[in-house]
Structures are given as C-alpha cells and as structure tokens.
Amino acid sequence: MKIYEAKLNDELLEKLISMSAEWEAENSTYGYRKNDRSDIEENRIFLAEQDGEFLGYLFGHEEKSERASSIMVDGTPYFEIEELYVVTSHRSEGIGRSLFHFAEQAVKTTGIEFIMLSTATKNYKSILHFYIDELGMDFWSARLFKKL
C-alpha cells in the first residue's frame, strides 16, 4: 500500500466525489452528503492506494485558532481534518491509521501544532476508540442532540 499527498486534478476530484457518494450511501454519519468540488478544493489531500485502487483518503486544511483557549492559545496553527474515509472492503486493515499518521507527519513539518476534527458518526463508541485510543487524540467537547 502506498500513502501519499496528492495534488487535485479533475480525475482525482471525480474519484473523491465517487468515494464520498459511497460514504453517503452507507448512512453511517449524521447529515453526510457526497462532496462536490467546493468541499474538496483548497484542502491538502492524502491518499491510500494499492495496485491502482484507491483505498481511502484524508483531506483537511490549515487554520489559526480563535476562541479555542481552553486547549490552545489564539493564533496557534492547526490542521483541521475535514474527512477521513476508508472504503468498506478495506476497513480494519490499518489504512485510516496510516493515513492519519502520514498526514500528521506531513503537516508537522509546516509548523502545525495541533490536529483537530469533528465527527458525526452514528457509531460514536467505535470512532472515539479509534481517535483517542489508537491515534492518541484528546477529547475536547461533544455536541449532543435528542429528536423530539
């Protein structure tokens, strides 16, 4: 398996949109809809590929913190992960972990001090285990809802 940072082109954009449509069809994330060009442009894109087949992706962008003083000083550079996706047929193979670690090392070289993300998965126990126990992230906040 090869993990690398990719530059966006029309062919890659089409593939990322197709993969995000697969994610939408899974109905595993509250409110998730497939991406369009504007969701992907201006992001750093990391891919997992094997024998010409895309196995997963991670994309996100660099920000400076504002009003996050409980965890970092305002103006601190951080990388916001927008999406991390692995195709269903290749889950539990360490691909998501590898994508995260590769992106972590890549953004660290540009002076990034934190990685942040939000998740709307319906399987919160599994995702918290993945991000906290397996990847070493810390829990910051939670937004809960109850339909009435």
Enumerate the language-model features and the residues they cover.
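Conserved beta-strand in the GNAT
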Residues: 47, 53-62, 80, 85
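Active-site rim helix/loop that mediates acceptor-substrate recognition in acyltransferases
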Residues: 24-49
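A conserved beta-strand-loop-helix scaffold within acyl/acetyltransferase catalytic domains
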Residues: 58-72
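Conserved beta-strand-loop-alpha-helix junction that forms the acyl-donor binding cleft
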Residues: 91, 116-127, 145-148
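Conserved active-site alpha-helix within GNAT-family acetyltransferase domains
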Residues: 97, 109, 113, 121-141
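Conserved acetyl-CoA binding element of GNAT-fold acetyltransferases
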Residues: 72-88, 142
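A short beta-loop-alpha structural element at the N-terminal edge
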Residues: 1-16
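Conserved acetyl-CoA-binding loop-helix of GNAT-fold acetyltransferases
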Residues: 86, 92-105
